[in-house]
Design a protein with these regions (language model features):
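Alpha-helical transmembrane segments of multi-pass membrane proteins predominantly involved
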Residues: 1-204
Length: 204
């Protein structure tokens, strides 16, 4: 089914081109819901492993990660700026990268695996563009989590889901990335000391 793949890509395109930093957790949750939907479509949704994987995506990626990221962004207290600087140059680069990614993947709307490869390439391209255009810590973490979702889309093309130990290890890696990243973002930045004022006698 093509609709969840299209939704995953749209949930990355909209925040990168039009969204603010504080809206990123919402779009990460939308991506996660679409990932769970895509996983249920690709594999047998009635199987125990598929149900556990879908529940893991909904709980960890759609609920826990966005909540932690939202709290960290609020603790940081920075202005709610654009996720990616809005200018024609970055827009042209972003659109070109997405088009090239789909061309590389040979994405055709009738071919679901090819479309999935195009979505993977588009997500990776947008993540790298975001990493290179915005050096703010929240935007950097959002780009990393977008790339994690691209890996999850690629994994959905596997004929069989990962074995339980591998799946648990990947979930722990993702959780560790989110927890450490949000902890670093939420830690207040040390302020530079104010310059010392000259003594009154020296000023005169």
């Amino acid at each position: 089914m093509r609709l969840p793949l299209i939704l995953i890509l749209l949930a990355a395109l909209v925040p990168v081109f039009f969204g603010k930093t504080r809206s990123a957790p919402f779009w990460l949750a939308v991506q996660a819901v679409a990932l769970a939907w895509n996983g249920a479509v690709q594999h047998d949704a009635g199987g125990l492993h598929a149900l556990a994987a879908m529940l893991e995506v909904l709980v960890v990626r759609a609920l826990v990660a966005p909540l932690l990221l939202r709290r960290a962004i609020r603790q940081r207290g920075e202005p709610n700026l654009d996720l990616m600087p809005s200018n024609l140059f970055t827009w042209a680069i972003g659109i070109s990268l997405v088009v090239l990614a789909f061309d590389f993947g040979g994405a055709a709307m009738q071919d679901v695996p090819a479309l999935a490869l195009g979505v993977v390439g588009g997500l990776v391209a947008l993540s790298l563009l975001l990493l290179s255009t915005n050096n703010a810590a929240p935007a950097q973490l959002v780009a990393v989590l977008f790339m994690e979702n691209a890996i999850a889309v690629f994994e959905s093309l596997l004929p069989e889901p990962w074995a339980w130990p591998v799946h648990a290890a990947l979930t722990l890696v993702y959780l560790g990335t989110v927890v450490v990243g949000c902890w670093l973002i939420g830690t207040p930045q040390p302020r530079a000391p104010a310059p010392a004022l000259p003594a009154q006698g020296e000023a005169s």
